[in-house]
Amino acid sequence: MTMYAKNNTSGKDMLSLLEWNKEELTDIIKLAVAMKTNPAHYSHILSGKILGMIFDKPSTRTRVSFEAGILQLGGQAIVMSSKELQIGRGEPIKDTAHVMSEYIDAIMIRTFSHEKVEELAYHAEIPIINGLTDLHHPCQALADLMTIYEWKDQLEGIKLAYIGDGNNVCHSLLLAGAMVGIDIRLAMPKGYEVDETILAKAENLAKQSGGKIFVTEDSKLAVTDADFIYTDVWTSMGQEDENAKRLADFGEKYQVNAELVSGAKPDYHFLHCLPAHREEEVTTEIIDGIHSVIYQQAGNRLHAQKALLAAILEAK
């Protein structure tokens, strides 16, 4: 067990938030805040550790934050794409997982299929971190919770409205919020709802934590008295062929703009995982306005992931 976490999370995968519990999640958030406050104290805790990073999707925040994070903790990173590995030429994931387990201490993978990450974790003898799949984006959710915690000094009872596509970011945000007792409101058009299985699991988590989940097509209803308003792009990577239809289906009704946010609390904060499509899901006025905390949120990817790495590796 790492000296920096109360729970025995050493060696644990982060495939989705479903493998973790409320106490473990809260410990990571608090450790992330401590690391952000006093980074020098933790600058050598992963000395000698190597993080392998595999990318099948383009990345800015995930790559830079993970690579900088492991370096700031005293470790090293090896960055790869599937095209550079034998897995890109047909080597079974099983073989890749076993071989890489002989060389490095953990793998972070950013890819399309969640099943690929699960298969990698099944065969690997080292921790696997999901840097994003089409179904989950747990590391983003850690940064989201950290940002909320920094502003409110609590998580339970916070009113969070998510407006937009029921995508991977929404799935992980929903699970994270339900786990820690957040009042979550989701607003999205028909055909873009969250995965039913994930919603059911989130509802069970909310019952245990005292959280609430409300799903509606009415974005104005969702943001009523909200502490935080969150949105994401309407067209994610790999969905470019659907862009015209998606723009029409979402439209101004689901755009975070001055009219919509007027229903939130006067001191609300705006969240976005980035990259953003200004004047689509959010107006420039809002994303660049005084309520926006998107750069703090993006910066917290670094600190939340450093805490995650410390929790799953044998920190010194």
Curated annotation (Swiss-Prot):
Keywords: Amino-acid biosynthesis, Arginine biosynthesis, Cytoplasm, Transferase. Pathway: Amino-acid biosynthesis; L-arginine biosynthesis; L-arginine from L-ornithine and carbamoyl phosphate: step 1/3. GO terms for cellular component: cytoplasm. It catalyses: carbamoyl phosphate + L-ornithine = L-citrulline + phosphate + H(+). Its EC number is 2.1.3.3. One of its GO terms (biological process) is arginine biosynthetic process via ornithine. InterPro entries: Asp/Orn_carbamoyltranf_P-bd, Asp/Orn_carbamoylTrfase, Asp/Orn_carbamoylTrfase_sf, Asp_carbamoyltransf_Asp/Orn-bd, Orn/put_carbamltrans, OTCase_ArgI. It is an enzyme of class 2 (transferase). It is found in: Cytoplasm. Carbamoyl phosphate binds at residues 59-62, 86, 110, 137-140, 273-274, 301. GO terms for molecular function: amino acid binding; ornithine carbamoyltransferase activity. L-ornithine binds at residues 168, 232, 236-237. Reversibly catalyzes the transfer of the carbamoyl group from carbamoyl phosphate (CP) to the N(epsilon) atom of ornithine (ORN) to produce L-citrulline. HAMAP family: OTCase (MF_01109). PANTHER family: ORNITHINE CARBAMOYLTRANSFERASE, MITOCHONDRIAL, ORNITHINE TRANSCARBAMYLASE, MITOCHONDRIAL. Belongs to the aspartate/ornithine carbamoyltransferase superfamily. OTCase family. This is Ornithine carbamoyltransferase. The gene is argF.
